[in-house]
Every structure is written in structure tokens, then in C-alpha cells.
């Protein structure tokens, strides 16, 4: 939004662009995010910067469903992405990393066309560690799943990226009560 408010004055825009890029880097390093991308229209100065700013066309790298793209609503879109590679300048690793993405796609209210988007990429291992530390009893399993049933974080890191069975996914997502017992297992679900 800050960039859009400065686009009529090229000198001010360049200054604001650098401030936003520095802020993104600060957030990334302060909070230990894997990476942060901001997606701009092709006509916007900086849309092809390639490190922190990409074209809106590049937003497709996250393989989001048509429904998520057509009606993003006011909520963030969470998903699990495999093999995301950072630009070589930021990481010289030959292989990509699996990440949890938190995306927002903002559309023009009149035209319904995307105006800009951003994605915060998170390390699933950090979430898994937090879940493991939540309970001392190792018989308690905690996990975060995406809408499609992909395990984004789990008390057992090895399960990150695997997919719940349709039966288990349905059990967790379609119950009206958040605390229930089934087959001698106790469940407490929290949905967005």
C-alpha cells in the first residue's frame, strides 16, 4: 500500500521502495522468517527486482487453488509448499526448502483484479519445535494442517509435508464441536 501511495512522484517512490525493502529484510531477520515476497503489478517500478519483489504473475509459484485465488476474502491463505528456491544472491543452496506460506492477495474492489500480494515463508521445523514444546507428555500429538489436509507442522518433524487420510481430515474439519472423543482418542480442534 505504501508503494501505491507514492507512485505519482518517481523520486519519492524510489525512496519509499528502498524503505519497504529494508523493512522486509528487517522483519525477515528479526522474526526468523524463511523469506518474504511482495508481488506487484508488472507496470509498477520494482516488480522485477527479483529478491523481495516479484511480478504478480509470479504469485502462481504457490500453487493455490482457483477458489483461493478468485475469492481470497479478508483472511490469509495458508499452505505447505515443497522445494521453494530463493534467488541465488540470497541462498546458494542447490536444493529448495519446504515451507509454510502465509499469503494475502488484495484485489481492487471495483475491477476484482489483483492489485498486489505478499507471502511470508516460514520454516516448518520451527513450528514443529513449538508444538513439541507445548506438552511434556510425548503421547500428545499436535499438528497444523492446511485445507487440503497437508500436515504443515507436527510434533514429529518427519510428518511435515505428508497428507492426512481423507477420513482423518473429514473428522477434524467437519465436526461442529471443537472438543470430542472418538475411538478412545481425545481431540481438540481449532479452526480459523
Q: Predicted segment positions?
A:
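Solvent-exposed, extracytoplasmic
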Residues: 17-28, 115-159
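Extracellular/periplasmic ligand-binding regions of membrane signal-transduction receptors
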Residues: 1-18, 37-46, 50-51
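Short, hydrophobic-rich beta-strand element in sensory/regulatory alpha-beta domains
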Residues: 33-38, 140-143
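Extracellular/periplasmic juxtamembrane segments that couple receptor/chemosensory ectodomains to their
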Residues: 136, 147-148, 157-192
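Amphipathic coiled-coil signal-relay and dimerization helices
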Residues: 42-52, 149-155, 189
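Extracytoplasmic/periplasmic ligand-binding sensor regions of membrane-associated signaling proteins
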Residues: 29-30, 42-121
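A short local loop/turn or secondary-structure capping micro-motif enriched for an aromatic residue
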Residues: 54-58, 125-126, 159-163
